[in-house]
């Protein structure tokens, strides 16, 4: 798992696992490819720079945003049960925000499990700030070692699948922690299955057992979803429009004028999918450089991000397509949010068939 250490003052080791240090070049290509596609899209990765992470955290504290409260309730009531599936002397890799990780790490400490925890983030400042806050929250740790990884999901797949012998943790098991409904933020559940499969195959290549702890939104109440993701909510709008500012930074030019754009959202219960769009208020021409100009008509939707609202049945299909089985689900009392334990098909657990536990408010 080759990586280059990045010096910084957070008190945790941070390694650069990016395959290409100039990640902006990949984003530039993704922007132009998306504007050429039908329908037009922009890469959701634009939303998750350091400022985007800050703005999303502000949005997540909105009264109507039900996911955060439900996830915290499950973590409060069930974290000690959830971490029982994480073996001692193993690796825990978090794909996403560190905002709610502390409860699980404290549960691992209480169970006295030596575990190496890696946090993956595409933003160096976002990663180091989160690690600093996590260390402040947790204080001295005796069993869990915390390390940061700078890179994308694809970089993490490559890091897992190409061990260099430099990593001091000799472990047969890697548990991937994916909270905040991030699994459903890809374009389609097939893409989510594909990414899960890539991680499983990377572990296979390194002779590691692979399992996932995934938190996913199962809410099917259209009114609740539409209220939570109302694009006129100022905090959500600020988060989304920051993605256009980030696009300008990536392109090295003011291709997007945020004042020319509004935001819209639509929930499609039959697909269990929420879509969020950028919509120009007038006809715009986007000069992205290299003599390339893209035209977007007034009212034409450009997809910013997708968010699946997947019930247990669909989540089971996602897992199965990726070569995983569902071992356990921990849910809130309304059945709108779940933590799932998925494991590779050749592994066995004493719990037997899939079980569901409910967390109460």
Curated annotation (Swiss-Prot):
Q: What's its EC?
A: 2.1.1.-
Q: What GO terms describe the biological role, i.e. biological process, of this protein?
A: methylation
Please name the Pfam families in this protein's record: Methyltransf_33
Gene3D superfamilies, alphabetized = Vaccinia Virus protein VP39 (3.40.50.150)
Q: What class of enzyme is it?
A: transferase
Q: In which pathway does it act?
A: Secondary metabolite biosynthesis
Q: What happens when the gene is disrupted?
A: Leads to a tenfold decrease in the amount of benzomalvins A and D, but not their complete abolishment.
Q: The organism sits in which domain of life?
A: Eukaryota
Alphabetically ordered keywords of this record: Methyltransferase, S-adenosyl-L-methionine, Transferase
What does UniProt give as the signal peptide span? none
Q: Name one GO molecular function term.
A: methyltransferase activity
- Job description of the protein: N-methyltransferase; part of the gene cluster that mediates the biosynthesis of benzomalvin A and D. The pathway begins with the loading of amino acid precursors onto the A domains of the non ribosomal peptide synthetases benY and benZ. BenY and the A1 domain of benZ are loaded with anthranilate (Anth), while the A2 domain of benZ is loaded with phenylalanine (Phe). N-methylation of Phe by the methyltransferase benX may happen before loading of Phe onto benZ, after loading of Phe, or after dipeptide formation.
Please give the family membership noted in the entry.
Belongs to the methyltransferase superfamily.
> Which named protein is this?
N-methyltransferase benX
Q: Which organism is it from?
A: Aspergillus terreus
The organism's lineage is: Eukaryota, Fungi, Dikarya, Ascomycota, Pezizomycotina
């Amino acid at each position: 798992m080759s990586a280059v250490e990045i010096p910084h003052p957070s008190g945790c080791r941070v390694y650069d696992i990016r395959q290409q240090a100039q990640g902006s070049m990949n984003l530039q290509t993704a922007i132009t490819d998306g504007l050429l596609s039908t329908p037009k899209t922009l890469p959701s990765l634009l939303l998750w720079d350091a400022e985007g992470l800050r703005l999303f955290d502000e949005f997540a504290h909105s009264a109507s945003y039900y996911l955060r409260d439900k996830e915290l309730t499950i973590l409060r009531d069930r974290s000690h049960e959830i971490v029982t599936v994480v073996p001692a002397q193993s690796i825990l890799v978090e794909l996403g925000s560190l905002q709610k990780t502390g409860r699980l790490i404290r549960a691992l400490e209480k169970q006295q499990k030596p575990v190496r925890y890696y946090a993956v983030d595409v933003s160096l400042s976002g990663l180091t700030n989160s690690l600093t806050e996590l260390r402040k929250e947790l204080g001295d740790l005796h069993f869990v070692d915390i390390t940061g990884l700078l890179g994308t999901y694809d970089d993490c797949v490559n890091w897992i699948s190409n061990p260099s012998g430099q990593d001091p943790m000799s472990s047969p098991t890697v548990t991937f922690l994916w909270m905040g409904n991030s699994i459903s933020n890809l374009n389609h559940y097939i893409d989510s299955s594909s990414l899960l499969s890539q991680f499983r195959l990377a572990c296979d290549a390194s002779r590691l057992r692979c399992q996932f702890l995934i938190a996913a939104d199962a809410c099917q109440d259209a009114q609740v979803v539409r209220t939570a993701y109302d694009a006129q909510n100022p905090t959500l709008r600020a988060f989304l429009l920051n993605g256009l500012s980030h696009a300008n930074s990536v392109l090295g030019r003011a291709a997007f004028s945020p004042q020319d754009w509004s935001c819209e959202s639509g929930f499609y219960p039959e697909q269990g999918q929420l879509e969020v769009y950028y919509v120009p208020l007038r006809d715009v021409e986007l000069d992205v450089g290299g003599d390339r100009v893209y035209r977007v008509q007034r009212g034409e939707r450009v997809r910013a991000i997708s968010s699946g609202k997947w019930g247990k049945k669909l989540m089971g299909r996602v897992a199965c397509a990726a070569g995983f089985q569902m071992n356990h689900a921990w849910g809130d009392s309304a059945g709108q949010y779940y933590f799932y334990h998925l494991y590779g098909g050749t592994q066995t657990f004493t719990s037997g068939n899939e079980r569901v536990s409910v967390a109460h408010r």
